[in-house]
């Protein structure tokens, strides 16, 4: 199994690469790419960690050598948020980066499963889909927007509030991956009850958690370490499913039946070909139903922005 990380010299990319080097199944290959000249050195650094995962690093304009034979491609390349920016402010720079990298994926490893981490995910996933479609290699069961950070934050914050162990929780989060489009389904956590005020406060905290980190880092970056952990969890789940493990479920932002929007985050059963089944979002509380209806305009605009970027 070969996993490629594009954007591997950045804060998320290095954290992700470290976790993959230590946690990928024995015999896996890990390929690191970034435009930054330090990237081969990051690979050398990680190569000293005693795990049976082969690692190579590539830098420069051409990602293709890193992509050859990749089964999974995780893309974290791009600029990070600064205080006062929201994820959509990143669009102008990151849209072009994602488009360029996906064009290289389309020609080099068109059958790979692709996880997009680069923000704004609501939009960059639409860009990736349109680029792959133009290249004639789009498979909607193999393109994912990685929203796992919203899930691990939900698990952490609920555990803190309710005195639970975070590992025992798995809060489904639907919608998109920014602001009001992030909707944790707190009503679906077995054996945990909330007051209306707790639901409103928790939902808001989960939606704004990225900003909490950006402000706490005081201009020194955005969420890189927790995002690296979230991306590793998603990437490792994908690898396990591709290798035939049964019953692997993760939420991610994918193209579905279009009931709510063309792309929508929901629980997915993963399998040997990517998505095996898009699972229903289940019964929502009145609060969740209202929040879902209230986000769809924003989500659809984010998606249209990505489609237009490629097709203009």
Swiss-Prot record:
First-tier enzyme category under EC: oxidoreductase
What does the record give as EC number? Answer: 1.1.1.37
As its record notes, the protein acts as a catalyst of:
(S)-malate + NAD(+) = oxaloacetate + NADH + H(+)
Q: Where are the transmembrane segments?
A: none
Establish whether keyword Metal-binding is in the entry: no
Q: Which UniProt keywords apply?
A: NAD, Oxidoreductase, Tricarboxylic acid cycle
- Any single GO BP term: tricarboxylic acid cycle
Q: Does the UniProt entry include the keyword NAD?
A: yes
What does the sequence similarity comment in the record state about its family?
Belongs to the LDH/MDH superfamily. MDH type 1 family.
Q: What is this protein called?
A: Malate dehydrogenase
Annotated organism of origin: Cronobacter sakazakii (strain ATCC BAA-894) (Enterobacter sakazakii)
């Amino acid at each position: 199994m070969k996993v490629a990380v594009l954007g591997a010299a950045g804060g998320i990319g290095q954290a992700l690469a470290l976790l993959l080097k230590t946690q990928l199944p024995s015999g896996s290959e890990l390929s690191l790419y970034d435009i930054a000249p330090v990237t081969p050195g990051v690979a050398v650094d990680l190569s000293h960690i005693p795990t049976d995962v082969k690692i190579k690093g590539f830098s420069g304009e051409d990602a293709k050598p890193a992509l050859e034979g990749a089964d999974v491609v995780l893309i974290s390349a791009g600029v990070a948020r600064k205080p006062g920016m929201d994820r959509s402010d990143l669009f102008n720079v990151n849209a072009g980066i994602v488009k360029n990298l996906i064009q290289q994926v389309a020609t080099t490893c068109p059958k790979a499963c692709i996880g997009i981490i680069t923000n704004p995910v609501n939009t960059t996933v639409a860009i990736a889909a349109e680029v792959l479609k133009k290249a004639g290699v789009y498979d909607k069961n193999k393109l994912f927007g990685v929203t796992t950070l919203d899930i691990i934050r939900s698990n952490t914050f609920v555990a803190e509030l309710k005195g639970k162990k975070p590992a025992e929780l798995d809060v489904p989060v639907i919608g998109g991956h920014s602001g009001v489009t992030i909707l944790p389904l707190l009503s679906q956590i077995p054996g945990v009850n909330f007051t209306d005020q707790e639901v409103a406060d928790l939902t808001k905290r989960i939606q704004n958690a990225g900003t909490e980190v950006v402000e706490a880092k005081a201009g020194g970056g955005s969420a890189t370490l927790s995002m690296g952990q979230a991306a590793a969890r998603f990437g490792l789940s994908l690898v396990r499913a591709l290798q035939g493990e049964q019953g692997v479920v993760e939420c991610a932002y994918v193209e579905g039946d279009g009931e709510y929007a063309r792309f929508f985050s929901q629980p997915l059963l993963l399998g040997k070909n990517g998505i095996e089944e898009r699972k229903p979002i289940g019964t929502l509380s009145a609060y969740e139903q209202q929040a879902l209806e209230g986000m769809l305009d924003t989500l659809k605009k984010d998606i249209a922005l990505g489609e237009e970027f490629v097709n203009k």
